[in-house]
């Protein structure tokens, strides 16, 4: 094969199968000098493997070294695939075409994308119109589309989604998407609305105009604080490394595109960490012992694609540690343990990972910070911890029922969440009310926690419980459980109230604010009342903007939107709203 040799940096060798030994056989790295026919053969083979591989164990990353690629190359992104450029800037790496369609669920004309989960694209330029027909647990970030972006496949069902730090030269068309979060983006125009379209930090004049609820647009003018997700780069002088963007405050628009042009590399606000500062993990050879040893030695971890079965938690004790996954690297708890336990409160980054419950019940999959009466405060003026592109799963993939009490517990103060899907499986293997059991999705006990694009679904009690002060959520999507057998199995407040709210803020909280919420019911198996979709304290510092409840289909229903405010949803397609709560 052509283009396979030693790089100018580090004198490291790429194999004829487009792999580097340091990253293993599930990471492909292409160069503009490679034979385009051979590149396309690899891309086609990966799509053939992964298009329908919803609960498979295979994971892949496809990286493109900086440069412009042959016009014949077209990438399609299937399950557990990540496609990315290796430049510092998206325009450093240019590929002709990238798409994700939704044709695999059947031959009918619906083009159903509601199961197009677990995939991502970042840090490159696509030189044509792009179809990105996806749902939850996906990401498109730091991308330049030199055409239009379609978030649907011919208006088939879709339930996304997340777009961040991206430039779209023409229109972005949401089509049939139920909901979507766009953060720090720019485009020529936005087309489409459905139940809950949320925009944060969009370039001036580019967020769509419309009055909610006639148009389902919720706009948050600026992003108060954000650390963009770190990403793998190849530097011609330094070799492979990870670029770590610095914190931006009160930001609007795309971080790498200013005044109508791409910024220069030297203008980027961040630091390059050489790959030598990372332990490069491989699922075939690494386990909790080798990974914890690396963490104790002060290393960051770069998880290459694969499924890592852990008998003990990975313990993060050092400030500023980075855990970065690629190719939807998956950490699976197999002995009732957590996957990750973070004890330091200072500027930890965890991103690009799928955390999977095992068949022995765990209390948690991720614990950020210690749950104590007096939490250690982060340094004044310091950077937040970042949790980005993090996905959690209970059931669906294993031959025995998966179990957990709750997936995520955030005890630390000053945390940014950026794109979560926390999912108790409603389909797949060993799925049912008494099989894949899980009480809660997300528990927040820390103060000053802000989450963008929080999606939590199908848990057996509250989906989300928030006890910390000054919490903020910008875009929330949630479906209550489909499989409640009967009302008596689904009672809150010590059995006195029918059903569980999806989102509950503790009555002792004084300050909390939310924007763009959509909570949906599909009581498939029984008539089940959910008294209210959201429970909030009635206090001056508690505010909610644009909250809707929808009964998709099935049995009724949702009685109120917030507490005992709003209309009921007792028939298929019924939608009730609260415009403002304060």
Q: What residue ranges belong to the model's regions?
A:
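Extracellular/periplasmic carbohydrate-active domains that bind, remodel
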Residues: 5-582
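C-terminal segment of classical bacterial N-terminal signal peptides
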Residues: 1-3
């Amino acid at each position: 094969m052509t283009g396979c040799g030693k790089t100018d940096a580090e004198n490291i060798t790429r194999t004829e199968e487009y792999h580097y030994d340091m990253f293993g056989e599930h990471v492909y790295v292409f160069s503009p000098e490679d034979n385009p026919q051979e590149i396309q053969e690899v891309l086609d083979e990966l799509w053939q493997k992964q298009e329908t591989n919803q609960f498979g164990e295979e994971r892949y990353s496809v990286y493109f070294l900086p440069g412009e690629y042959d016009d014949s190359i077209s990438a399609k992104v299937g399950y557990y695939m990540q496609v990315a450029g290796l430049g510092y800037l998206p325009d450093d790496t240019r590929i002709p075409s990238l798409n994700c369609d939704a044709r695999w669920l059947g031959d009918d004309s619906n083009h159903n994308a509601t199961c197009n989960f677990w995939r991502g694209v970042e840090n490159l330029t696509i030189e044509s119109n792009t179809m990105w027909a996806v749902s939850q647990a996906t990401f498109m970030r730091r991308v330049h589309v030199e055409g239009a972006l379609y978030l649907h496949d011919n208006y088939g069902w879709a339930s996304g989604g997340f777009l961040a730090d991206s430039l779209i030269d023409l229109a972005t068309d949401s089509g049939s998407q139920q909901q979507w979060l766009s953060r720090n983006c720019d485009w020529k125009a936005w087309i489409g609305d459905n139940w809950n379209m949320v925009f944060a930090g969009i370039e001036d004049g580019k967020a769509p105009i419309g009055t909610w609820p006639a148009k389902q647009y919720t706009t948050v003018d600026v992003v108060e604080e954000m650390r963009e997700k770190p990403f793998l780069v190849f530097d011609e002088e330094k070799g492979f490394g990870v670029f770590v963007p610095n914190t931006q405050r009160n930001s609007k628009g795309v971080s790498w595109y200013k005044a109508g042009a791409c910024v220069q590399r030297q203008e980027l606000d961040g630091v390059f960490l050489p790959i030598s500062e990372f332990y490069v993990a491989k699922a075939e050879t690494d386990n909790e012992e080798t990974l914890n040893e690396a963490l104790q030695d002060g290393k960051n971890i770069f998880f290459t694609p694969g499924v890592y079965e852990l008998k003990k938690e990975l313990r993060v004790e050092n400030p500023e540690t980075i855990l970065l996954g690629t190719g939807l690297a998956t950490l699976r708890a197999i002995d009732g343990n957590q996957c990750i336990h973070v004890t330091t409160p200072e500027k930890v980054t965890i991103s690009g990972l799928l955390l999977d419950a095992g068949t022995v019940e765990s209390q948690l999959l991720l614990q950020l910070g210690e749950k104590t009466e007096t939490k250690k405060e982060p340094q004044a003026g310091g950077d937040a911890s970042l949790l980005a592109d993090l996905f959690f799963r209970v059931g669906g993939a294993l031959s025995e029922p998966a179990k957990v009490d709750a997936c995520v517990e955030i005890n630390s103060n000053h945390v940014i969440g950026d794109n979560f899907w926390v999912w108790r499986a409603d389909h797949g293997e060993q799925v049912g009310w008494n099989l894949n059991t899980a009480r809660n999705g997300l528990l927040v006990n820390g103060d000053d926690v802000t989450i963008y694009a929080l999606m939590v679904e199908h848990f057996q009690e509250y989906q989300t419980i928030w006890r910390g002060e000054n919490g903020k959520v910008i875009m929330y999507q949630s479906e209550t459980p489909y499989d409640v057998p009967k009302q008596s199995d689904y009672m809150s407040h010590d059995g006195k109230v029918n059903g569980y709210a999806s989102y509950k803020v503790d009555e002792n909280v004084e300050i909390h604010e939310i924007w763009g919420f959509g909570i949906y019911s599909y009581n498939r198996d029984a008539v089940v009342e959910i008294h209210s979709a959201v429970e909030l304290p009635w206090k001056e510092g508690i505010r909610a903007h644009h909250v809707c409840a929808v009964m998709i289909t099935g049995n009724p229903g949702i009685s109120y939107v917030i507490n005992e405010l709003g209309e009921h949803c007792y028939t298929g397609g019924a939608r009730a709203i609260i415009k403002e709560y304060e």
